[in-house]
Amino acid sequence: MSKKKVLHLAKWYPNKVEPLFGIFIQKHIQSVQESCDHKVISIYQTNTIISNIHRKVNYLNNTEEVVFYHKKGLLNKIRVLYRVWKETKRFKPHLIHAHVMGWTSSLAFLFSRTNQVPFIISEHWSGYRKKGYAQLNFASKILRKISARKAEQICVVSNFLKEDMIKCGVEANYSNIGNVEDGKTLDIGKNKTFSFVFAGDLVQETKNVKGILEAFYEVIKHHKNIKLDIIGDGKDLKNYKDLSDQLELNNHVSFHGNQSNEYVFKTLSQSHVLIVNSHFETFSIICAEALSCGIPVISTKCGGPESYLNDETGILIDRDNNNQLTKAMMTMISDYDKYEPEKLKSMVHQFSMDSIGEKINQQYLRALN
């Protein structure tokens, strides 16, 4: 019997401009690639192309990935959506999987209505907690709510995200499916200097790296031989560098900029503790990656992380609380030996390719039956 065909409409997806953009969506698709025939279509706006619309095809482990690059402008957006519609019709899917609500869920809903094809939605967007949802226009909100009600299932990465969506009036059949953590490990030694690490977007309103620098400043008064590695880029990078300079931390703090997944894993493996000081996270894959590298985590109670972090994996603190963060960092230095690397690694088996793939496959079977 031939395999069922699943079409993935991805609002975020790795591309030539941003190779790590929505990589967690790509990993979700990879986790189920053996069960069905898959095709991915995503759209990316950029002015780096010569023509108004450019179609680029890539094959990853027998999955066809199509990225439509288009220049800014309403007419170009309409044209590219029309091409996505035609490509969808040619593929003749048995099921559509929309990743991150927006044009993806709207097109999935319309195709479902006209071609009697079921669809499900996976949501990762943190905008339901922030101002993002409130700033959507009336039509966008209505389309999201209709698509959500008509979808066979909405898969969210945490109960925290589900609760935020319900508060915004997005009613649906919900299920919780976390992100994939590959379980990569590197057999390399730790830094000789006790090392804290942060990896993520350098945006103050979400990640609060300012609080990390201020807490680190307090800790270094008591422990001189420590360091802090900051991986990532964003609009507040200069502000953070200026603050590091102002606090005279430059001999202890290193800014690494945007780096590859491999670089992040290597740095995590060499470090002692990951710090997540976010105001909100729908899941926080970096926490799971740290555990897979055998290092404990200091994290704020910011939504997603506390669904799988506990006293055995590190220390949970209140949001926007520098005193608690300072104390947690001091405790990690003094009590570090209590965290067993192999036990930390075992905590992320629930997010393995096989485990997440099985959960997604169950949703496919329900939708198709």
Which role does the model predict for each range below?
Residues 1-52:
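N-terminal subdomain of nucleotide-sugar transferases
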Residues 7, 189-207, 213-216, 229:
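Conserved donor-binding/catalytic core segment of Leloir-type glycosyltransferases
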Residues 20, 118-120, 127-147, 183:
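Nucleotide-sugar donor phosphate/pyrophosphate-binding loop at the beta->alpha transition
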Residues 24, 42, 144-186:
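Donor nucleotide-sugar binding/catalytic pocket of nucleotide-sugar-dependent glycosyltransferases
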Residues 27-30, 114, 137-154:
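Membrane-proximal helix-turn-helix segments that form the acceptor-binding/catalytic region
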Residues 279:
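Aromatic "clamp/platform" in nucleotide-sugar-dependent glycosyltransferases that forms part
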Residues 296-299:
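Short hydrophobic beta-strand element within catalytic cores of glycosyltransferases
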Residues 311, 315-322, 331-336:
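Conserved acidic donor-binding segment of nucleotide-sugar-dependent glycosyltransferases
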